From Swiss-Prot:
Quaternary assembly: Homodimer.
Protein name, entry field: Serine hydroxymethyltransferase
Source organism superkingdom: Bacteria
Organism: Trichormus variabilis (strain ATCC 29413 / PCC 7937)
Keywords associated with the record: Amino-acid biosynthesis, Cytoplasm, One-carbon metabolism, Pyridoxal phosphate, Transferase
Membrane-spanning intervals of the chain: none
Pathway: One-carbon metabolism; tetrahydrofolate interconversion; Amino-acid biosynthesis; glycine biosynthesis; glycine from L-serine: step 1/1
Length: 427
């Protein structure tokens, strides 16, 4: 009789096995609308849960500090080659443990403490690692931030240029965590060249769309590109550094190891290789196109129901609901949808009067439920469920109806039907 990994876990540690089982059930029973989350394939899960977790492999393929890396080298080289092919890059480093680690390695390569960086303000849709004062990027470097136009809630490249000319940053950062519109990398490169700055594109949210040719490509215009490998790319949680400059790539490699990390997580790198291989298949482009269409369907229905969206819509996988028009906070909206088994997150909106712990926005995304097979009709229904819940916050009857409709959708599109952990759910 063949024993599975879950059998070993159940026998060894039923408490952890039970909690994993509960998390699996939660993922199955909820509409996952967090824009930065997705469901990776069973093949990626298998790679991450393999014996590769046992192996130390400091260094790069063919140049390790440990013996016994002959198979690890082949796996990591496949991941590198697939990443380069997927994004059209001259160089790829697949070792960063996260997007934040990837960004830090770029800073270590291009900057010295005290240099100036320029990125989008976190409250307008930027990221912690783009100069937030609570992050090392905001502690080690001088920081100036740009935002979106108050009128359009979109990037104003003339304003960004004026700020860059005034501040003269050494590094200009584009790419965001909560910006629903297309980014013009060519315009950013023009601004960077005019002030003598390096240009970094952090495409963590849109990497899958870029790889599918459904968002402009940053590689021809940016000195360095970083991304996570989950989100729209649908791989394991991790980071990736790309560049069109092979010589710069060598410096970036040294900033990853030994500059900022030790041994790479080769089981995760194997998962990245599998995910990159999946993304190179024609079906992935169809998936990415559906992600965009589903986001538009959700956005359109929310607007049809009278809810305000930041920038009045979306070009990618995410949208921000501005709840000020219905006199509600993001914290309250997050709680309301959570009560009917919809997972989202409160988020600041541009020029938000609320604190980051309260916010005036709700961020929604389409990647995860698109992975489960849902299309525009289902996302239109999701829009109606969200609107019904937010516009009737005190109605238990509406809440119960919304919860029933969520369950019906989840039942129609099962998640990981092959996965079972045969232990009772813990009390």
């Amino acid at each position: 009789m063949t024993r599975t990994n879950s059998d070993f876990l159940t026998n060894s540690d039923p408490a952890i096995a039970g909690l994993i089982n509960q998390e699996l059930q939660r993922q199955r029973d909820h509409l996952e609308l967090i824009a930065s989350e997705n469901f990776t394939s069973a093949a990626v899960l298998a790679a991450q849960g393999s014996v590769l977790t046992n192996k130390y492999a400091e260094g790069l393929p063919g140049k390790r500090y440990y013996g016994g890396c002959e198979f690890i080298d082949k796996i990591e080289q496949i991941a590198i080659d697939r990443a380069k092919q997927l994004f059209g890059a001259a160089h790829a480093n697949v070792q960063p443990h996260s997007g934040a680690q990837a960004n830090f390695a770029v800073f270590l390569t291009l900057l010295a403490p005290g240099d100036k960086i320029m990125g989008m303000d976190l409250s307008h849709g930027g990221h912690l690692t783009h100069g937030s004062p609570v992050n090392v990027s905001g502690k080690w470097f001088q920081v100036c931030h740009y935002g979106v136009s108050q009128q359009t809630e979109q990037l104003d490249y003339d304003q960004i240029r004026e700020l860059a000319l005034r501040e003269r940053p050494k590094l200009l950062i584009c790419g965001y965590s909560a910006y629903p519109r297309i980014i013009d990398f060519e315009k950013f490169r023009s601004i960077a060249d005019e002030v003598g700055a390096y240009l970094l594109a952090d495409i963590a949210h849109i990497a899958g769309l870029v790889a599918s040719g459904l968002h402009p490509d940053p590689i021809p215009y940016c000195h360095v590109v970083t991304t996570t490998t989950h989100k729209t790319l649908r791989g394991p949680r991790g980071g990736l550094i790309l560049t069109g400059d092979a010589e710069l790539g060598k410096k970036l490699d040294k900033s990853v190891f030994p500059g900022s990390q030790g041994g790479p997580l080769e089981h995760v790198i194997a998962g990245k290789a599998v995910a990159f291989g999946e993304a190179l298949k024609p079906e992935f482009q169809g998936y990415s196109a559906q992600v965009i269409e589903n986001a538009r369907a959700l956005a359109n229905q929310l607007q049809n129901r009278g809810l305000k969206l930041v920038s009045d819509g979306t070009d990618n996988h995410l949208m921000l609901v501005d709840l000020r028009s219905v006199n509600m906070t993001g914290k309250r909206a997050d709680q309301l949808v959570s009560e009917v088994n919809i997972t989202a997150n409160k988020n600041t909106v541009p020029f938000d009067p609320q604190s980051p712990f309260v916010t005036s926005g709700l961020r929604l995304g389409s990647p995860a439920m698109t992975t489960r097979g849902m299309g525009e009709a289902e996302f239109t229904e999701i829009g109606n469920i969200i609107a019904d819940r937010l516009l009737n916050p005190d109605s238990d009857t509406v809440a119960q109806d919304c919860k029933r409709r969520v369950a019906a959708l989840c039942d129609r599109f099962p998640l990981y039907p092959h996965l079972e952990i045969p232990v009772p759910v813990l009390a």
